[in-house]
From Swiss-Prot:
Active-site annotation: R203
Membrane spanning residue stretches: none
Similarity field: Belongs to the thymidylate synthase ThyX family.
Name of the featured protein: Flavin-dependent thymidylate synthase
Cofactor binding annotation: Binds 4 FAD per tetramer. Each FAD binding site is formed by three monomers.
Keywords: FAD, Flavoprotein, Methyltransferase, NADP, Nucleotide biosynthesis, Transferase
Role of this protein: Catalyzes the reductive methylation of 2'-deoxyuridine-5'-monophosphate (dUMP) to 2'-deoxythymidine-5'-monophosphate (dTMP) while utilizing 5,10-methylenetetrahydrofolate (mTHF) as the methyl donor, and NADPH and FADH(2) as the reductant.
Species lineage: Archaea, Methanobacteriati, Methanobacteriota, Stenosarchaea group, Halobacteria
Cofactor: FAD
Organism of this sequence: Halobacterium salinarum (strain ATCC 700922 / JCM 11081 / NRC-1) (Halobacterium halobium)
Matching HAMAP family: ThyX
PANTHER family with a match to the protein in the record: FLAVIN-DEPENDENT THYMIDYLATE SYNTHASE
Gene, per the UniProt record: thyX
């Protein structure tokens, strides 16, 4: 799994703060320099003022200004299961790699058992891993080895069957039906800081599945490089308060 920031609003936190100050100014923000708009905010430098105002907005629950900037992220190599969870957040915009137009006919099925093309869940290899709705806890080495072997054989066979169906002339859009839900997919997502914080409220939580938790952490890390004061405050003061930022 990898996440990369593709494109984003420049100076997003200046935009957030200008938008927020608009609500309390008699002058038109369109004609007002940033320093003037921020004159009444505590801080010795513009950066301190931005940080302080952003903290105030988030503390008070004034989330509207965080909807003005937007960022687009490229996501590589998440499972179709994780993608389905992510795209339930309908306030974001998505493009998803197509299995109708992209055929995986050059993938070595032997490599699939080692993690290529199909995401391997931790419970397939880690005997100490405990997931939700799990029937058993600790397992012996023999059972763990059998579990891993069954998983690897299953995903390898699925890819072999998929490629055989392609060779028999079945279109990719139909042959894909035999591929597992763990098949990797690339996604492009666009959303604003408020929306991303809402995603994190739900998907960085302990009861979210491991893969989307990892994806959410990578999105937050990338967003912190773009919008640092916002996501540093969110991480320190607001993270894990589930659903507080519901749009």
């Amino acid at each position: 799994m990898r996440v990369r920031l593709l494109e984003a609003t420049e100076n997003p936190e200046e935009l957030i703060c200008q938008s927020a100050r608009n609500d309390y100014m008699s002058d038109w923000v369109g004609d007002t320099p940033l320093d003037t708009a921020m004159a009444s905010v505590d801080g010795d430098t513009t950066d301190e003022k931005l940080s302080n105002l952003i903290a105030q907005l988030l503390t008070r629950g004034h989330y509207g200004p965080f909807e003005h900037p937007s960022a687009t992220f490229a996501i590589e190599g998440v499972s179709r299961s994780c993608m389905a969870q992510l795209t339930r957040h309908r306030h974001a915009s998505f493009d998803v790699q197509s299995m109708r137009y992209v055929a995986f006919d050059d993938v070595d099925p032997a490599a699939v058992a080692e993690g290529e093309l199909v995401v391997t869940p931790p419970s397939a290899t880690d005997p100490d891993w405990v997931g939700r709705n799990q029937d058993a806890g600790d397992i012996d080495e023999e059972t763990m080895a059998e579990r891993e072997a069954v998983f690897q054989a299953s995903v390898r066979r699925a890819v072999e069957d998929y490629q055989e169906l392609l060779g028999l002339g079945m279109p990719p859009e139909d042959a894909r039906f035999v591929l597992p839900i763990g098949t990797e997919v690339n996604v492009v997502i666009t959303l604003n800081p408020r929306s991303l914080m809402h995603v994190a409220d739900m998907r960085a939580a302990a009861d979210a599945q491991w893969e989307i938790r990892e994806l959410t952490e990578q999105l937050l890390d990338a967003a912190a490089q773009w919008c640092p004061h916002t996501f540093e405050y969110y991480d320190a003061e607001m993270k894990h308060r589930k659903n507080r930022l519901a749009p």
